[in-house]
Amino acid sequence: MAQILQIAAIALATVGTGAATMSVMNEDIPDLQVPEGQWEATGALDGRSFDVLGVDTASGAVLEDLLVFRDDTFQSVDCQNYCDFGWSDYKTKEVDGVIHFTVTTICPDAPHTVVFYGQVNGDDITVDGTWTTRRWYWTNQIVLTATGKAMPDMAQDASG
């Protein structure tokens, strides 16, 4: 019985000092690093939507999505369907006639953060991104890259 009490005391002391927590936590994985610059909320892509096809760079899984811009906000239909991310503010800058954009979306109900960085040149779009899930015991990140084309009009409702 005394041995059981000793083990319980050691376990409580370990948990109480945080030693157990530190031994099981993974280091954080940073979100996608977006290039610095004069990012502004210009609405430059408002009224446009893009059908994109991409891949998870680690697994090769194919990712299909519709990216929608309206009223200075952005929505990934795939993110909306998965976790009700909603509409997020986006920022742009123009470099040599190409519109660069960035947006960070956060799931309100789970620890998911998605960072997009892309370029729109006419009707063509390229996008890089990270989907990071942070929990106290592990961090997982999906790195994605995608390309796509502008949709003819924004008749589709992405409000989810």
Task: Map each language-model feature to its residues.
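Sec-dependent N-terminal signal peptides
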Residues: A2-A20
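Membrane-interface motif at the C-terminal end of an N-terminal transmembrane signal
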Residues: T21-E27
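Central antiparallel beta-sheet cores of small beta-barrel/beta-sandwich binding domains
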Residues: I29-V120, D128-T130, R134-G160
